[in-house]
Each structure stands twice: as structure tokens, then as C-alpha cells.
Design a protein with these regions (language model features):
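Structured alpha-helical
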Residues: 1-215
């Protein structure tokens, strides 16, 4: 006898037309939500970090940062549409942070841009390290300029054609099957065949920064 199993609830980003930023205890049971952004980037004290965006309203956001943020901290949130929004941390609780925008945003316009415009770029984090790149039987050492869940930008003094299949190894991460998306002026845009898990990328960024600070 087959037993029906209820599907797990989907943890997706939601949006609201409210002019107020999300509150710590805000629950929107019974309110219709639309899927919006999943991963964003924040700039705090000149440093770029990744975050998860749980909820966005016209007045603010509910995010899960991967760094310590105290109430009153000014920062800039970058959405996957490329829009950057100045804001201030208003509260923190159980790993979630509420931020208030300096000026209200048009949620409908942001949503429309995300659905109808070109596919947005994933937030990229600038790094300074080297990767081992395998192109068939050839192996190269290339400088990494930035990294995202979806790929890396590499500096190369060798010519690698667009579309070439590669294996990219970043120190401390599993080798990633990838392909060259573009090649120009000594730089390569490389796309991973599979997205890096956000938690793995954040842990790697932290470890990389700790090594740089200790050097």
C-alpha cells in the first residue's frame, strides 16, 4: 500500500508592499507570497559579504547574514538585479537581521525587473588567491580575481578558447567541473557546471580571509 507523504514546505524569499521593514516576529501566514531573490551581497565597512534574503518590503529587508552585524550598522545591500540599496541594521535575532532602507524601494518594479529582464548576475566576491586549472591534459596555475556560487574570474597568460571544458580547483574546495564563458584581454570568465553551496562558499571565503590576515 502506497503511503502519501506531504511535501516539505518551500523556504523561499517573499515580498510585501508594506512601507515598513520586516519585524522580528513578523509572520505572514495566509498572505500570498511571490518568489523573489535568494542570494544577495552586502557591503559593510568596505568589505563585501554574502547573505540570504528572506523577505523584502518597500521599507526594508529580513536577511540572514554570514557575518556579525550589530544594530545601527550602516551597510549596502546588492540585489541580484544589480540594484544597490543603502540601509541600516535595525535588529538581530536568532541569526536573522532586519534592515531598514534609507529610502523606500519599488518592490513591484524590482520584481518585474527580476522576471522580465536578463538573467541577473550572482553576487561576486573579490579574492586574491590562485586556482589550479586543468584543460584536458594541460594544467595551469591562474590568479583568481573574484568568485561566486556560479563561477570565477581568472587571470591567464595562456589562451583558452571560449566553450572549453575545464576543472577548476580552489584551495580548500572540491575540484569543480566548469566551462569558459568568455575570454578577453588575459582574463577568463568561467562558469561552474553546478552551483557551489552557499554555506561552502561562505566557509571558504572566511578561511581565505583568515589566511590572508595571518600572512
Amino acid at each position: 500500500m502506497n503511503r502519501q507523504v506531504d511535501p516539505l514546505p518551500i523556504d523561499s524569499t517573499s515580498y510585501s508592499l508594506s512601507s515598513k521593514p520586516p519585524a522580528p516576529s513578523e509572520r505572514r501566514e495566509g498572505t500570498r507570497h511571490l518568489s523573489l531573490f535568494r542570494v544577495g551581497a552586502i557591503t559593510v565597512n568596505g568589505r563585501r559579504e554574502l547573505c540570504l534574503i528572506k523577505n523584502i518590503s518597500e521599507g526594508g529587508m529580513l536577511i540572514r547574514p554570514y557575518c556579525d552585524l550589530a544594530a545601527g550598522t550602516p551597510l549596502i545591500i546588492e540585489l541580484k538585479t544589480g540594484c544597490s540599496v543603502p540601509c541600516t541594521v535595525s535588529w538581530r535575532r536568532d541569526g536573522s537581521v532586519g534592515v531598514e532602507f534609507e529610502t523606500p524601494v519599488d518592490v513591484v518594479e524590482i520584481l518585474s525587473t527580476a522576471q522580465e529582464g536578463p538573467r541577473p548576475r550572482m553576487p561576486r566576491i573579490e579574492v586574491d588567491c590562485f586556482a589550479t586549472v586543468r584543460d584536458g591534459g594541460r594544467v595551469y596555475r591562474m590568479r583568481v580575481h573574484d568568485v561566486s556560487q556560479g563561477g570565477v574570474k581568472l587571470e591567464s597568460d595562456v589562451i583558452v578558447e571560449s566553450g572549453a571544458d575545464l576543472v577548476v580547483s580552489l584551495p580548500g574546495l572540491e575540484p569543480q567541473a566548469a566551462a569558459v564563458r568568455w575570454s578577453e584581454d588575459g582574463f577568463l570568465g568561467v562558469t561552474f557546471n553546478r552551483l557551489l553551496p552557499l554555506s561552502d562558499l561562505v566557509d571558504w571565503l572566511r578561511a581565505t580571509r583568515e589566511q590572508l590576515c595571518a600572512a
